[in-house]
């Protein structure tokens, strides 16, 4: 609804700007502390017109004509700004739209195909806490883009050819594989033992090098052992992702781009640019004119390709199949992501959009798969579920165990997802489960509780025969400040989706979710719903609670959080 409001404001301002004798193609709209929207257009026009921004704003305001039935109530000049307020048509139209569209409210306004890659951790062990941020940011972005209307395909790019996989493959022939363990954890066990063995006996490293050469040449037996190792690890990783409510559509493997000839082809395309040179026997790409002093190695001295080379082929493939390609990478990929983008630009291919995130840690310290000192995502999720159960048990001791377990899982996973996604990607963060699970703080559990509260109000209204979802609503009665604030916040749903889809900053949607829950709780605090003095007013307010329930449910789903009906 807010996008429709913006469109109407833009049209009204365009006409007024033209009538005032100015020209502009962007009304420079933004949020305002004094109104529903504000325009800074007068600042830009003032320099051209050689007038003060205040005078320009007043001239435009004097030409404002608001069509009948518009969502816009008024436009006024305040100094150099043009402030815009939404009217009753907007307020009442929003409520009616939510009741009519339900789960579809606020979505499906964009089009285009997007390939989004996230997580893509090496399959040499389980996901750890550091990987979780990648998964949650990527999955949330995918949900935002899908709800906005894009055709989104989510990829987990599987490194099935790298040195680490060669070590795992080699290790499976040397060490016992614990089939009683979760497969990704069992893979980590043999990988850690293999690294210790290779450190103790450096001469065995040549066996790893040989495996890498054989797999790139297409040796069937070597490929089979690599596939076995990778598939075991990925099967365990999928289980962990499912626990977090994260799912991928495709798991493309690096090796497929070797087998298809895409890697050889892209090497030739890069050579054709005249940017390649031989450096100590390796083929490198000179990207100095893109600001990179360090060359990019795309082929080793023994003729084998690198992860980067195969990644270039993968991105070329993606670019041919989508309007936008998006990658979620950790901060340690800043350099390589820039080189990747520059190389694709140099050969005239579609460039990816990157979401680079800083790392998440725990108060306990850092994580490393190579040394065996890490805290797995499984360990964290099990711990958070246990702690969530204790919180639910304290609050609802009278409820059966299965209820507590179900709510604990929903709330626990929601706490992890929300606490991580609420932080801007470029900021590092420390995950503290006590803070994440604090029902008094405005985190995931607070938003979920707001939804459960709405469900409880509606259930009580139905049980007491006070309301039916089929009842018509008199929107003209919803005039209290807290009612109007809640309706305006719900109307912002599509605008927040649009903003996040364009800027790829999911934390802003998490902030919106918290503000929406707060607006609902403020409404319930300041107005009487079930005990409203007038029957028609009571029915309208209950219907508004139902609208809030639907938008809260949509918001939680977009964030990948469960929407419990009772907590």
UniProtKB/Swiss-Prot annotation:
Keywords: Aminoacyl-tRNA synthetase, ATP-binding, Cytoplasm, Ligase, Nucleotide-binding, Protein biosynthesis. Its main location: cytoplasm. One of its GO terms (cellular component) is cytoplasm. It comes from the Archaea. GO terms for biological process: arginyl-tRNA aminoacylation. A motif ('HIGH' region) lies at residues 121-131. Signal peptide: none annotated. It catalyses: tRNA(Arg) + L-arginine + ATP = L-arginyl-tRNA(Arg) + AMP + diphosphate. The keyword Cytoplasm applies. SMART domains: Arg_tRNA_synt_N, DALR_1. It is found in: Cytoplasm. CDD domains: Anticodon_Ia_Arg, ArgRS_core. Its EC number is 6.1.1.19. Transmembrane segments: none annotated. GO terms for molecular function: arginine-tRNA ligase activity; ATP binding. NCBIfam families: argS. Belongs to the class-I aminoacyl-tRNA synthetase family. This is Arginine--tRNA ligase. It comes from Methanococcoides burtonii (strain DSM 6242 / NBRC 107633 / OCM 468 / ACE-M).
């Amino acid at each position: 609804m807010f996008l429709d409001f913006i469109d109407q404001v833009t049209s009204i301002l365009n006409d007024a700007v033209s009538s005032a004798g100015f020209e502009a193609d962007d009304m420079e709209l933004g949020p305002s502390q004094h109104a529903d929207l504000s325009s800074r257009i007068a600042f830009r026009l003032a320099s051209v017109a050689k007038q003060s921004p205040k005078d320009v704003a007043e001239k435009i305001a004097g030409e404002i004509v608001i069509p009948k039935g518009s969502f816009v109530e008024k436009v006024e000049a305040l100094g150099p700004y043009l402030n815009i307020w939404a009217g009753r048509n907007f307020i009442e139209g929003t409520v009616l739209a939510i009741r009519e569209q339900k789960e579809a409210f606020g979505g499906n306004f964009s089009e285009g195909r997007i390939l989004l890659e996230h997580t893509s951790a090496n399959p040499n062990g389980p996901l750890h806490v550091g990987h979780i941020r990648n998964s949650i940011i990527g999955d949330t972005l995918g949900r935002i883009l899908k709800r906005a209307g894009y055709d989104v395909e989510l990829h987990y790019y599987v490194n099935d050819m790298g040195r680490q996989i060669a070590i795992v493959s080699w290790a499976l022939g040397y060490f016992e594989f614990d089939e009683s363990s979760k497969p990704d954890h069992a893979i980590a066990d043999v990988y850690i033992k293999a690294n210790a063995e290779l450190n103790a006996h450096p001469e065995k490293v040549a066996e790893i090098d040989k495996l890498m050469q054989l797999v790139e040449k297409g040796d069937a037996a070597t490929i089979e052992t690599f596939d076995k190792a990778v598939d075991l690890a990925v099967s365990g990783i999928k289980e962990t992702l499912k626990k977090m409510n994260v799912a991928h559509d495709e798991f493309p493997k690096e090796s497929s781009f070797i087998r298809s000839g895409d890697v050889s082809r892209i090497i030739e395309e890069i050579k054709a640019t005249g940017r390649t040179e031989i450096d100590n026997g390796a083929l490198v790409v000179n990207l100095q004119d893109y600001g990179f002093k360090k060359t990019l190695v795309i082929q080793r001295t023994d003729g084998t390709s690198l992860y980067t080379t195969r990644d270039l082929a993968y991105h070329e493939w993606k670019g041919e199949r989508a309007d936008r390609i998006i990658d979620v990478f950790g901060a340690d990929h800043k350099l390589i992501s820039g080189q990747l983008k520059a190389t694709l630009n140099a050969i005239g291919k579609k460039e990816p959009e990157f979401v680079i995130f800083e790392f998440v840690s725990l108060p306990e310290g850092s994580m490393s798969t190579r040394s065996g000192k890490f805290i797995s995502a499984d360990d964290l999720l099990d711990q958070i579920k246990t702690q969530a159960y204790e919180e639910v048990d304290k609050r609802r001791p009278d409820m059966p165990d299965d209820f507590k377990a179900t709510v604990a899982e929903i709330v626990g996973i929601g706490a992890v997802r929300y606490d991580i996604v609420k932080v801007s990607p470029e900021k590092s963060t420390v995950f503290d489960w006590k803070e994440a699970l604090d029902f008094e703080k405005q985190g995931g559990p607070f938003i979920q509780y707001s939804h459960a509260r709405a469900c409880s109000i509606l259930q009580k209204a139905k049980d007491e025969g006070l309301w039916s979802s089929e009842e018509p609503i008199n929107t003209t009665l919803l005039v209290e400040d807290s009612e109007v604030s809640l309706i305006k916040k719900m109307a912002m749903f599509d605008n927040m989706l649009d903003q996040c889809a364009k800027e790829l900053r999911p934390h802003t949607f998490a902030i919106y979710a918290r503000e929406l829950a707060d607006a609902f709780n403020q409404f319930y605090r300041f107005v009487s719903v079930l005990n409203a003095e007038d029957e028609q007013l009571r029915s309208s307010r209950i219907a508004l609670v139902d609208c809030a329930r639907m938008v809260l449910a949509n918001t939680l789903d977009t964030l990948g959080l469960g929407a419990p009906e009772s907590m």
